[in-house]
Amino acid sequence: MHRLLPLVVLALVAPAAAAPTRPPFTIAETGQGFDTIDAAVQSVRMGTATILIAPGIYHQCTVQAGGVITFKAVTPGSVTFEGTTCEGKAAFVLRGQGSTVDGIVFRGMRVADGNGAGIRTEIGDLTVRNAMFLDSQEGILGGHPSAQKIVIDHSTFAGLGQCDQSTDCAHAIYLANQGSVTITASRFERGTGGHYVKLRVPNVTITDNSFDDTRGNKTNYMIDLPEGATGLIARNTFVQGRAKENWTGFIVVGAEAKTYPSAGLRIAANDARLAPGETRSPAFVADYSRAPLAIGTNRLGAGVRGFETR
């Protein structure tokens, strides 16, 4: 009886040892698995699919050239794409018909032109939720002359931006299109240069976000709308730090051009304060557009001036 025990143990262990490892990237609709994110993306072609991503740290990137794709972490926050970019741009270069990114972390993106991003959106609508963009030159970057709709929700942007690695600055979020950008319930902190949010779009919704610049370094504005915009900026909290490259305004409208109307842009129910030890007196809203902005009641801490026309 004693001599049979090792054989029994081996018989029980062998099937488990021989079980195949499931590929980390799976098409939800078909169950087909892939070893790389790009192979999964290319399999979709012009179709519609959800790519489920297993927990792990991936030194991979992908270019979506067509179709409608949802990139979804099986467990939110457990999937990290780190340090690898495609086309010298970003971990995810998106130019399909539409994209959703859900629960994914992007970290350590750097490229030669200073614009290394987690996501580069070039064509198609984009939704980002439950994502993190960390310690990179840029978080989300994109520009296309179309009525693109971009939605960013419940996401974190930290350790992003630069103005000393290229001619033009990089920012936590920098988007340009002829449609709209919505940013909700997200956190911005520890910027390393540029603006936290820079948008060249006609319509914006920026609500219920937290901008904590206390540990920022060489940062500029919290929100820059350089060509004007209409929409809503409300219920955000802002804390401006001491190590600013440009400390003169929290929200700046129309500093470069009057491409888009700004009349009626509503800015209300926000809370803006200075970090301890900051003695300079910035404007909460600095307006170059000369349009009749709809500025409601905002809670402003000591030293923050409500409005300035430039």
For the regions a protein language model found, what residue spans apply to each?
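Right-handed parallel beta-helix/beta-spiral solenoid domain characteristic of secreted/periplasmic
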Residues: 28-35, 50-52, 62, 66-114
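Leucine-rich solenoid repeat scaffolds
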Residues: 279-310
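Acidic Gly/Asp/Thr-rich repetitive segments characteristic of extracellular carbohydrate-active
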Residues: 21-59
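Right-handed parallel beta-helix
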Residues: 54-55, 68, 72-80, 97-108, ...
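Hydrophobic h-region of N-terminal signal peptides that target proteins for export
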Residues: 10-18
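Extracellular beta-strand/beta-solenoid scaffold signature
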Residues: 38, 83-93, 112-120, 135-144, ...
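Sec-dependent signal peptide recognition
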Residues: 2-7
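Flexible, charged surface loops at secondary-structure boundaries
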Residues: 19-22, 42-47, 63-65, 94-95, ...
